[in-house]
Amino acid sequence: AYQRQLLELRGLSLSAREHHAMTVSDFLVRGLCAAQDLSALTIPDIERYVALRSRELSRHSLQHVVGHLRSFLRFCRDQGVIERPLDAIETPRTHRGELPPQALEWSAVQALIRSIDVHSRAGYRDHCILHLMVHYGLRPSEVVALRTDSIDWDAAVLHVVQCKTRSDLFLPLAPQTLRILRRYLDRERLAHGTDHPELFLRARCPSGPIERWAIGDLFKKRVREAGIELPGHNVYRLRHTF
């Protein structure tokens, strides 16, 4: 019932619902005393669990866990499982500068994109993917969801399906981006045929759409080949540079 509420009332993505489920499952196993029922849950029980997780997680990650708990406890009260409001959990604060900066230096990102040999295996593809992430802030999940018909050439618009927010985004495309997309399609993508509607395909057999995890791999590969020093090789830093 709780998962259904997260989907139907809050519209959360599958990934977000899975994170909620992991927190709730762990709380029910480690947050409750043996044979304790949810109806007997107390604030000290919740505080002990949060203290336990605080020894395992960063404050940033703990914020998400506390948010999941609040949501679940509100649901339990609405359903009559618990009588008292127990969702007033203090959220751990994070401070500016506590986490590494998310954005990369613009000059380094530009150097990375320029360094890609488009004549190498999947060179046009990788150049196009990284260009879209840097200039339009696309997530890996949004990149792999793009199709050949996601591009409206006449209107110069890219249709992006946002998996995280379950919404559609229509992005105006700059002339440079249109040229990069057209070059990729003409010189590399169309050679793979029309069996798959996805815009970006695997470079090796078996033929098929590229997977989300592969976006991170190609980013690390291109950084390594470029010989550029970047503070961390997390591909999500590209979209935060946007």
Kindly give the residue locations of the regions a language model identified:
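Conserved catalytic core of the tyrosine transesterase superfamily
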Residues: 1-242
